[in-house]
Amino acid sequence: ASNLAMALAKKYRAVMLIDADLRNPTQIRLLGRKAMGKEGLDRLLQGTDLSENRVMQAAAYDEETNLVTLISETPCRNAAKLLASPDMAELLSVVRKTMDYVIIDSSPMGMFADGDMLADVADHTLLVVRQDVVSACDINDAIDAISQGKATFLGCVLNNMQTGSLLSRISGYRYGYAYGYGYGRESRGGRSEEGSR
């Protein structure tokens, strides 16, 4: 999500990255403290004021990357409740007015319903897939779940692909979701045994 958001922001577009993985926020680790605004997404959704002014004050802007970020720093126990609330839809409605693109990072598909809930309030969805982690059957199940939302499913993005391995493993047909980040247990091969996005 952060790579896509930064690539779009380099085109001098107004881009906001929202870390909606409230269970295990990872964007703070990827982007650093400069990406943390005055308030995290969780605190913003628990408040009563979702005006454009308040939302933009809560977010952080990085002049170097031209990226606006709205992220959380610590895990939130009531993530599903906050993401399913009318406030999340209202927040997206507010930022759509000022941003050209709003990129939302969610928790892994298949482990939590967060991605399904966000697919109901987003315009489009992409499934980020990491090679050799989860079976093609699980990917198809995730696509089916996403496709039932209101957002248009745009497709999959292959992440962490090993050079030359696609052709050599075409018969194996195993790919995985680009996540992990503390959700799955590590297997002997260093791959997450569970956790999909």
Which role fits each region the language model picked out?
Residues 1-197:
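P-loop NTP-binding module
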